């Protein structure tokens, strides 16, 4: 199989919608999708797809994959916030979610976590192959992509430049002149990094945090 001829995608959440980056072996392009169903339709011919969203939830405690990924990130560990326990998905208010989380883990959840719960739930309800759609964390991907780069915040100009330079090794053709309207620049960069990890997973060059199967796995 010639992996250069195959397509790989990366998916990143963008304020209630999704950015999908597709790498076809030479060119990297981006598309906006309004739902998980649309993401699945857009990526159905891709060999592997990296998703920057928790695809497994713990029953109690923390996921091993996140603990290992935090250790890998070092000073950038705060870019990973812990996935809540599955019972929290039943909460209808932030206060209720915090109470449920405290009763099981002893800790509340962050507002940031609360705001991504609808997206987490959307992926839980979706029908996809967990060996094709794999969870990734873009900051882990960028550090695996360029281990010697001291990445600045992705919100800074320096950080954007560093990530673009790293992605340039994946593709010389970054279609930055025709990005979908709406998402901010780091959403596009994160989706591209997710596509990079999807390709790595496909060819067996990836790094795994957590389990070898999809039960608690992040790949980079």
What would you call each of these model-derived segments?
Residues 2-220:
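RNase H-like (RuvC/DEDD) metal-dependent nuclease/polynucleotide-processing core
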